[in-house]
């Protein structure tokens, strides 16, 4: 019999009780994070190409989609998920990245439908010196511009999810 890897979004094919089906997406996020970490390591040695950035974007897309999985598996957490995304700029920005790479025009952004992913160069360093000219991601925040190192941004999103899952999703039921 062939090994089953998944495919039934939230159906019985996951082999998990409905309230635990978010775990399939969390495991996927962790696998994509490993790929993003490999890209980070590569960025210290050599210039990244478009396919490298595609992998980091795919990680962020899976990171945002975790929200849907948690909400569908544990509807009672919707208000806490809303509060999490309202409190942390980075998670709203993660949503914008997810939707911005999926749709040509983002109609209801969390922050900035026209965010930018770019490389910032220090002209006093060797041109293209790996690890010294970071890939940044920038979002408009009102009249201000918020810039993040791309890999620090991915770290923050992962840390926020890790904390939320430990504190709210996996925590014992409140009585």
Residue ranges and their predicted role:
Residues 32-35, 62-69:
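Amphipathic, well-ordered alpha-helical segments in soluble domains
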């Amino acid at each position: 019999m062939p090994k089953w890897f998944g495919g039934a979004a939230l159906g019985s094919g996951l082999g998990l009780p409905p309230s635990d089906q978010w775990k399939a997406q969390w495991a996927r996020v962790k696998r994509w994070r490993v790929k993003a970490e490999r890209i980070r390591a590569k960025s210290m040695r050599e210039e990244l190409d478009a396919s490298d950035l595609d992998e980091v974007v795919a990680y962020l897309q899976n990171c945002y989609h975790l929200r849907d999985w948690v909400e569908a598996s544990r509807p009672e957490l919707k208000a806490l998920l809303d509060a999490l995304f309202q409190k942390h700029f980075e998670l709203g920005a993660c949503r914008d990245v997810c939707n911005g790479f999926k749709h040509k025009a983002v109609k209801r952004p969390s922050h900035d439908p026209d965010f930018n992913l770019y490389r910032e160069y220090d002209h006093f360093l060797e041109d293209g010196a790996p690890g010294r000219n970071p890939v940044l991601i920038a979002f408009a925040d009102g009249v201000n511009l918020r810039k993040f190192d791309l890999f620090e941004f991915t770290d923050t999103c992962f840390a926020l999810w890790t904390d939320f899952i430990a504190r709210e999703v996996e925590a014992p039921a409140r009585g």
